[in-house]
A protein has these predicted regions:
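Short, low-complexity disordered leader/linker segments with a strong preference
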Residues: 1-30
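Extracytoplasmic "Venus flytrap"
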Residues: 31-52, 56-60, 67-77, 97, ...
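Second-shell loop/turn segments in exported
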Residues: 38-43, 89, 126-132, 155-163, ...
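An alpha-beta-alpha
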Residues: 53, 140-187
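Periplasmic-binding protein-like
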Residues: 89-96, 116-118
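Hydrophobic alpha-helical
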Residues: 95-109, 199-203
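Flexible loop/hinge segments that line or gate small-molecule binding clefts
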Residues: 108-132
Length: 203
């Protein structure tokens, strides 16, 4: 729900820039791009983003057109963002941390396109960032793990050692420690956002 509200807010701001201000003129359609790091069927991060995209379509109807692309983090993502901007996107959601620098680079070339980047820390005149309070869920998980562990050792598989993920680890550890002062966390870095096989091997 928070993700959807963020999308709605961004769309409202974008609409203010691209839609005519005169009531007797027809309103233009806002074109919104979504760039995903994983498949929409992952039942996780990308899946929830795509549910938000679909709800935006339902709410705004023919006032909005959405397009989507799935591309790994890295140089090719910049090409995909550029292509979206060239094809008329007014607002582009770049939905993974590793898209940060490509987002900044492409935004500099397309000052009239608005960008929303997930979980990053770099901004520009036309680049904003968004995130969620993931640490709240990690706090609950840590509390449960602290109660349940019989060895006092809790394994934690982290995606990447970046602020967003580390904040979640800290939250889990603090709340596990609160109920079990002897608890220890063992962190394993997967260095991927979506690789079920690798994540299972790490576990």
């Amino acid at each position: 729900m928070k993700l959807l509200k963020g999308m709605m807010s961004a769309l409202a701001v974008t609409a203010g820039f691209v839609m005519p201000s005169y009531a007797d003129e027809p309103k233009d359609q806002v074109k919104v791009g979504f760039i995903y790091v994983g498949p929409t069927g992952d039942h996780g991060w990308t899946y929830r983003h795509d549910i938000g995209r679909q709800q935006v379509e339902e709410k705004y109807g023919d006032r909005v057109e959405t397009v989507l692309e799935s591309v790994p983090e890295g140089p090719d993502s910049e090409r995909v963002m550029t292509d979206m901007a060239l094809k008329g996107a007014d607002l582009i959601f770049t939905t993974s941390f590793g898209y940060m620098d490509p987002t900044i680079n492409v935004a500099a070339k397309f000052p009239n396109v608005k960008f929303e980047h997930a979980t990053g820390y770099k901004q520009a005149e036309n680049v904003s960032v968004y995130s969620a309070r993931f640490y709240e869920g990690r706090a609950v998980q840590g509390h449960i793990a602290g109660h349940m562990t019989k060895s006092n050792i809790v394994g934690y598989i982290g995606s990447f050692p970046i602020p967003e993920v580390i904040r979640g680890i800290n939250s889990a550890y603090i709340h596990a420690k609160d109920v079990n002062p002897d608890v220890q966390f063992k962190i394993i870095w997967a260095y991927t956002w979506f690789d079920p096989t690798k994540e299972a091997d790490a576990a």
